[in-house]
Amino acid sequence: MRSRLVLAAGLFSLLGSAVAGALTVSPAPSLSKLPTTATVVRAVTAAEGKTKVPTGSITPPLTSTGLYWTSVNPGLSNPSKPGCVINDAATTIPAVIGTSCAYGDPTSTRVVALVGDSNANAWIPALDTWGYVNNVKVVAVVHAACAPWERPWLPKDRPIWGEITERKCAVWRRSMMSKVTALSPSLVIPVGITATDKSLKMPTTAELTTALTAMVTYFTPSKVALLEPVPQFTLASSVLACVSGHRTSLDQCEVRRSAVTSNALNQVFRQVATSKKAAVIPTLNLFCGPTRCPLFVTLNAQNYLVYEDGYHISHQYAQIIGAALPLASHVK
């Protein structure tokens, strides 16, 4: 082990700008300073009682929450991988995802696959860090607005975001599932959220349960790990808008832990995991204290903004908590 990641607009459009050189990227954290799970949990708990925007440096800056990231792996010069991270209506995935879409330790024979929508993309910095530290290859195949499970409740040709439709997501999803299965990973981590556009039909609990069960069954339950869904806010812009108006009363902006645990998707995740004997990775404590889920967390004397927007965690917070992910026991 060496010494010590409207619906996807912000995350994916900023990614494109970063590749074009329009954004400055944040430096990679020092491997020797990556916090443990216990350290992150203590920091989150300590942040819960703070009501003011922290003084000093904040990463990502409030003026550039989509700031791109630099991998802890010095051999990974560009974390953006065409076809592996799709932000438009394209559906073509690289032929050899084990090479083209590799993060973490690309030379390892142990493989973890990360699949899903823009929320899966937000987890890439965390899984990249975790994989590099633990000598595991992480293969990421993600598509904006395309959940890793089927969504028969959505109209096939109605735009979800931009020109992305469920019909196009279905084409991408079939290709993703086939290529990931052929890769024979030790673990598959599917990440997604239900529709955030209220004009789109929301699934019933039964529909969501059926969809997640089918996905877990396809990948083989014993090889699936579901990350606990992270806190979400009402609108994509709601986090920053609230912080702007409540710089000394951040508790007015925070999500309560009870709201996250009672979230329909979170409950269905647990029900499906229990019935199919899949794993649920306890990540909620990396975001929420006993009562609330803070917007800012301080680690190694650096203030981190936890969220890029109302639906996505920031690249920088995802990266700094990467080594704290409790995944090791699930990867053979």
Predicted regions and their residues:
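Extracellular/periplasmic envelope-modification machinery, especially enzymes
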Residues: 2-332
